[in-house]
From Swiss-Prot:
Transmembrane segments: none
Source organism (scientific name): Comamonas sp. (strain NCIMB 9872)
Family matches, as Pfam families: adh_short_C2
EC number: 1.1.1.163, 1.1.1.245
One MF term in the entry's GO annotations: cyclohexanol dehydrogenase activity
Protein's UniProt name: Cyclopentanol dehydrogenase
Binding positions (NAD(+)): 18, 37, 63-64, 90, 155, 159, 188, 190, 193
InterPro entries according to UniProt: NAD(P)-bd_dom_sf, SDR_fam, SDR_superfamily_enzyme
Family matches, as CDD domains: 3beta-17beta-HSD_like_SDR_c
């Protein structure tokens, strides 16, 4: 307990799935969590549950593709908490289509949510972190930002972009003592992937290369996020933390 005591952390896409698990664990370990999402009902429910468990959490309605929303969110956090120690860029979507079946609109939508949001969020938090001369940004990518697989060209390209954007930011932001790292989960059992895992053929295709033979639980990925946000990772910068059950080793 207490691994991120008194840290102020903003998490995007925090109302459900992996994002909710990030928020729950960070709050349990002492952080004040600003849980952001487009879904206000689920967001408020999530905050209420975290508070019921003794954690400190606040909800922010945030469209991660909207620059003005980001400005407002950061201003709110600074007004209420006086600082922002960490940003977890978790929000993202998944579309399963091969490149030949992917429309321009689908490609643009994936990049808007999975890549533009990470850029906007990162840019929005730089100034308060620079003034404090410390900060931490964790970008949630994927193993499919490291390796290719059939049937998800736009998603994989977007997660690869997040990986390299993380490297670029690590170089740019090092003089301000802002650490930037990416997390690369393998197959995770979340509402977004459950339909795929419930189909035997697609489950075999996804889990076959995973050496541990199963999907990750969201908490197993959240532990990696917690580590990167914590001071335990004070010399971890520009890194890729892969949490994939051996998928990329196979």
């Amino acid at each position: 307990m207490g691994r991120v005591n008194d840290k102020v952390v903003l998490v995007t896409g925090g109302a459900m799935g992996m994002g909710l698990t990030h928020c729950t664990l960070l709050a349990r370990e002492g952080a004040t969590v600003y849980l952001s999402d487009m879904n206000e009902e689920l967001g408020h429910q999530a905050v209420a549950e975290i508070r019921r468990q003794g954690g400190k959490a606040h909800f922010l309605h945030l469209d991660v593709t909207n620059e003005n929303h980001w400005t407002g969110a950061v201003d709110t956090i600074l007004a209420e908490s006086d600082r922002l120690d960490a940003l977890v860029n978790n929000a993202g979507i998944l579309t399963l289509k091969p490149v030949q079946d992917t429309s321009n609109e689908e490609w643009d939508r994936i990049f808007e949510i999975n890549v533009r949001s990470v850029f906007l969020g990162t840019r929005a938090v730089i100034e308060p972190m620079r003034k404090a001369h410390k900060g931490c940004i964790v970008n949630v990518s994927s193993i499919y930002g490291l390796v290719g697989a059939p049937g998800a060209a736009a998603y994989e390209a977007s997660k690869g972009a997040v990986r390299l954007f993380t490297k670029a930011c690590a170089v740019d932001l090092a003089p301000f003592n802002i650490r930037v790292n990416s997390v690369h989960p393998g197959v995770i059992a979340t509402p977004m992937t459950q339909q795929i895992l419930d189909a035997p053929q697609s489950a075999r295709a996804l889990l076959g290369p995973t050496l541990l033979g199963r999907a990750a639980q969201p908490m197993e990925v959240s532990q990696a996020v917690l580590f990167l946000v914590s001071d335990e990772a004070s010399f971890v910068h520009g890194s890729e933390l892969v949490v994939d059950g051996g998928y990329t080793a196979n």
